[in-house]
Amino acid sequence: MNKLEKESVIGISALLVHAAKIDEIYSDHEKDLIKNFIKSYLENNDVDEALKKAEQIENNSNQLLNFTNIIKKNSIDIKKDIIKNLWKVIISDNTIDQYESNLMRRICGLIYFPDKECAEIKMKLINLK
């Protein structure tokens, strides 16, 4: 899989934080999942700093979906990994509410990721739980 630049990882992580908070609960488990995503692209010593920056961006931004432009420019493998990580965060509490589903539909549409593949990723992760 290709690597992402640090600023791209932070921007995408802000989307992950947004997905985690959209149901108004931001758990330690969700933070750990986001840290795992960050670790897959950055050095271990950058993880806490990257998460902190991502949380600040999420807190201060009304335009989080602008970060989909970062995703859109990447390979299908990276897009799949990002979608998979978004779903991991969303289903970590064993529920998917309407806001979470809507967020995923919007993100997939904005990055030109096929709905069918998005649904397949979601179902695989649900079946693993």
Label the model's feature ranges.
Residues 1-129:
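Small-residue-enriched hydrophobic alpha-helices in membranes
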